[in-house]
Amino acid sequence: MAEEKEVVLTKEGLEKLENELEHLKSVKREEVAERIKQAIAFGDITENSEYEDAKNEQAFIEGRIISLEKTLKKARLMEDEDIRTDVVSLGSRITLKEMKSGREVTVTLVSSVESKLKDGKISDESPVGKAIMGKKVKSTVSVEAPAGTIKYKIIKVEK
């Protein structure tokens, strides 16, 4: 069996996953177990939608717990000294300028596990993440998008 790829996480990302796992194990598991118990009390479970819903939620929760445990098992905490400012790396905070519009956007490059575009965290596996990884300030990159090629200039790289 192939060795699983290491997942590099920021301190914030690691804490978020650990907190979610703890919440699922200590709160959500108990809540859904209680819902199943109540649904069984209604009687015949063959046509009991509350029971079915609770069992489906239980399966989802258990699947998410397994997924989080696997991710955390292969996780490595990104140290501050791992974040470079000479080139774009995981953990870098990058200011990009879209060449056509001149609009600037600042993003943080993180692993796919903790990416969240609305928080300005983009995945190193995304088209933009792949394009800027390892590049220096003043570099220009092209990103293929459904609407065509978008060109960005790297304005700033910081921790």
Swiss-Prot record:
Coiled coil stretches, renumbered: 1-76
Keywords: Coiled coil, DNA-binding, Transcription, Transcription regulation
Short name of one Pfam family: GreA_GreB
Gene3D superfamilies: Transcription elongation factor, GreA/GreB, C-terminal domain (3.10.50.30), Transcription elongation factor, GreA/GreB, N-terminal domain (1.10.287.180)
Tagged with keyword Transcription: yes
Gene Ontology terms: biological process: DNA-templated transcription elongation; regulation of DNA-templated transcription elongation
InterPro entries in alphabetical order: GreA/GreB_C_sf (IPR036953), TF_GreA/GreB_CS (IPR018151), Tscrpt_elong_fac_GreA (IPR006359), Tscrpt_elong_fac_GreA/B (IPR028624), Tscrpt_elong_fac_GreA/B_C (IPR001437), Tscrpt_elong_fac_GreA/B_fam (IPR023459), Tscrpt_elong_fac_GreA/B_N (IPR022691), Tscrpt_elong_fac_GreA/B_N_sf (IPR036805)
UniProt cross-references to PANTHER family, sorted A to Z: TRANSCRIPTION ELONGATION FACTOR GREA
Function: Necessary for efficient RNA polymerase transcription elongation past template-encoded arresting sites. The arresting sites in DNA have the property of trapping a certain fraction of elongating RNA polymerases that pass through, resulting in locked ternary complexes. Cleavage of the nascent transcript by cleavage factors such as GreA or GreB allows the resumption of elongation from the new 3'terminus. GreA releases sequences of 2 to 3 nucleotides.
Family: Belongs to the GreA/GreB family.
Protein name: Transcription elongation factor GreA
